Regions:
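C-terminal interaction appendages of subunits in large macromolecular complexes
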Residues: 2-268
């Protein structure tokens, strides 16, 4: 639940195959701690900017918190407390908003809730937050991601499961409710699909990078993934050739930023 600062030019540039450096070499964090989320911020000295944007936190157990960006505008080497985390919880997503975004939170069991960020009051840095989504009481459910929708006309919802299945759905398929509910089905979770691993807001101009736990990476065009109903199973996005392999990470990138970097794979 702590926040640290780092200038992008201080990060050593590497290739796509390089190992990278331990984050402890760049930030003054404990050796047993880990980075769970990061934000790219345009400026921390522009008063108008930092007083008109918010940092939105979401935790594994469904807690959400909104704090004015200004609260994080004074860098300290040892970091500052960004959110008070309850026992057995952790931050899984952090987004920056302008105060007028639609929020969608998804859980591992394939449900998602949509509400306006105005439903989350502004709190101080050390606050715990409020209930964003109610999880299933099965001991295994948890939040897998949170997205902030800025443009309802061009953005859609992309979800990906453990076994490499995924799909896009229209935002309007998710009815707007009050925060704290259980939400609606965002993917039909089966033994074949595995549990949900991520949710992303995407446009036709985006590419998707999918990395499985065995280290294989593919890139695919979001426009090649057809729009489907939110309660459907989706289509296979990546073939997992090794037994017990699963999707490890998914990220959204602009198409032009990856030209000639990673081979594109067709979607079944």
């Amino acid at each position: 639940g702590k926040c640290y600062w780092l200038k992008v030019y201080e990060i050593p540039e590497g290739t796509k195959n390089s190992k990278g450096r331990a984050i402890q070499n760049l930030l003054n964090i404990d050796s047993d701690d880990a980075v769970n989320a990061y934000l790219r911020v345009k400026s921390l000295s522009d008063q108008e900017y930092i007083n008109s944007h918010y940092v939105l936190f979401c935790t594994k157990n469904g807690v959400i918190k909104k704090t004015l960006l200004e609260q994080y505008s004074r860098p300290r080497q040892n970091g500052v407390n960004a959110i008070t985390i309850r026992e057995d919880d952790r931050v899984i997503e952090v987004r920056m908003t302008n105060g007028n975004n639609e929020i969608i939170i998804a859980n591992r069991n394939g449900r998602a809730i949509r509400f306006h960020e105005a439903a989350v009051r502004v709190m101080g840095r050390t606050a715990t937050g409020v209930r964003g989504i109610t999880l299933d009481n099965d001991g295994q459910d948890e939040v897998v991601g949170m997205i902030c929708i800025k443009d309802l006309e061009t953005e859609s919802v992309m979800v990906v499961s453990e076994q490499g299945y995924g799909k896009r759905s229209e935002i309007e398929d998710y009815r707007k409710t009050n925060r704290g509910g259980k939400g609606v089905k965002t993917m039909n979770i089966t033994e074949k699909t595995g549990k949900l691993v991520t949710i992303k807001s995407v446009t036709d101009e985006n590419d998707l990078m999918i990395i499985n736990k065995s280290g294989i990476t593919i890139r695919l065009k979001v426009a090649d993934v057809r729009i489907m109903g939110r309660a459907t199973q989706g289509v296979r996005l990546i073939n997992l050739e090794k037994r017990n392999d699963q999707i490890g990470s998914v990220c959204k990138v602009t198409t032009e930023s990856l030209e000639d970097e990673v081979p594109t794979e067709e979607v079944e």
